[in-house]
Amino acid sequence: MKNSFVRIAAIVTTAIFALAGCGKKTETAPAKPAASYPLPEPPLVADCEPGIPGGRLVAALYGEPKTFNPITGNEQSSEEIYRHLFAALLGFDCPSEQVSPGLAESWTNSPDGKTWTFKLRKNLRWSDGEPLTADDVLFTWNDIVYNPDIDNVMRDGLTVDGKKFTVTKVDDLTIQIVTPGVYAPFLETVGALVPIMPKHVLAKAVADKTFISAYGINWDPKNIVGSGPFRIKEYKPAQYILLERNPYFCEVDKKGQRLPYFDNVIYTVVPDFNAMSLRFLSGESEVDDFIFPYEYDHFKAESAKGKFTLLEPGIGLETGCFWFNENTNVNPKTGQSYVDPKKLKWFRNAKFRQACSYAIDREAIIKSIYSGRAIPNYGYVTPGDKKWFNPNIRQYPHDLAKARALLKEIGIEDRNGDGTLEDADGNKIEFALNTNVGNSAREKVAVLIKSDLEKLGFKVIFQPIDFNTLVQKIDATYDYECLLLGLGGSGTDPSLHINVIRSDGFTHNWFPRQKHPSTDWEARLDYLMNAQNKTLDFNERKKDFDEVQEILSEQVPMIFTVTPFFYAAVQSDMGNVRATPLSAYRATWNIEELYFKK
């Protein structure tokens, strides 16, 4: 079952290397054979080559997880771990973009397209051995996902015209979900994206209103219960996270061998992506999902020696982008505006943002940082998404003259000949640009963006900061002016992006959680995203989402930079590797199927 819910610490010490050195030579006590635990009826059968059980996979993790909770988590260092711990009603095959059975063995849909019925497998178990039933599905939806006291990125997209779905239990193995109207991406989102959570573990946290801290990094690992292929055995902050096979996992291969094949997966925490690459190249880890284009030549040369296989899945869904803080609200704690009013006036002007986009020399970024292995990107959807990409959006090739002309139209020009632009009130155009430390490519892109904008006449203060602090600025404090991050990797269906595009979205980053759209174009985005959600006609959905892309490229609330080619690497003796550019986890999206051939 492939889950799609699927965003800084010191380098581990020699003592930890003794624990995490070679994945195939484990000194941990062997796990109880998976066959000794009862299987669900019927078990899920993986469509893969039967492999060899055993061994330990070693990988590196950039940054510390903030949580092991898939409902409240919203960044990659956490997702890297919790994606292994939980399962959904359905699975999702990334290369083919097809849903498949999961915890549910079957499902049906009514003729009007609004009533969905899921039949769970008999004798499903949580990772602690407790039964998994329809009560857990009901609890997940009614007590967690739709709980107004629990902030989560999923809820934004799980409505029709603002109305929630009705989720009811038919019997212990049957759940019925009724949508207020046709909901086009039902199977991809409801079925494959919503992780089912254990009522027997988390009901008290929901009742006590402490769910936000449930499954936190301070929880005892044995109490973090899920139904995915692995469970947490041990967590040492700033050092490693040791996962062990979930003996109750519901999937087997064609020979009847229970998945996953690996006994353990260990993630050693590293401070940056360079350290991640060094660990792989030195043989201290056995998989690297995040190889950057500028590393390609070195990895290609090393792979020729036969120690590992370099994977080249192609252009993916991820892109770099930066945006300005357009939040018009007042901080209730201070009584002050989140954004300096004079700067807010600049940031909320589309011509200001268009000028910034014209100022960026994307070809220089591609050549100097990505070694030519990237393409310019001007829109929300990358060319890697062949199904939904709109090639007719407005583009912004590097043109400082156009940028200056646009700024002059809104009263921004060099008024005193000092080389710095001022607005109509004489305020110098100056702001801080943040990105996360540890991603050297992104930091280099930020330096080039700063340089390009300064050539335009802005003063830009570049301040890289810790990733978790950056997330807090985006999600909670809104204490920033301009941010550069990556975007993408969450799937291709338009409805998976409602939380970003719709104005009330949890991750509508430039101005999140609006009670009412703050602009006419955001209101139009809301309408279009709701409209495409309510029809099963692909052509109608494509038309609506094409317009969404056109609005975003015209209004540029996010200024996109480049989309890199994707690369990954695995040790040469790893089986069932099916690399894809359509997942952030290019080589390990199907980790339960991976195994060592010898």
Q: Which role fits each region the language model picked out?
A:
Residues 570-598:
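Long beta-strand-rich cores associated with HINT superfamily self-processing modules
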Residues 3-4, 8, 22-49, 94-95, ...:
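Extracytoplasmic/periplasmic ligand-capture domains
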Residues 155-208, 234-236:
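Surface-exposed binding/hinge segments that line
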Residues 561:
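Active-site-proximal polar cores
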Residues 41-44, 57-111, 142, 225:
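N-terminal lobe/hinge region of extracytoplasmic solute-binding protein
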Residues 8-14:
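Sec-dependent N-terminal signal peptides
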Residues 201-206, 373-392, 567-572:
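Mature extracytoplasmic/periplasmic domains
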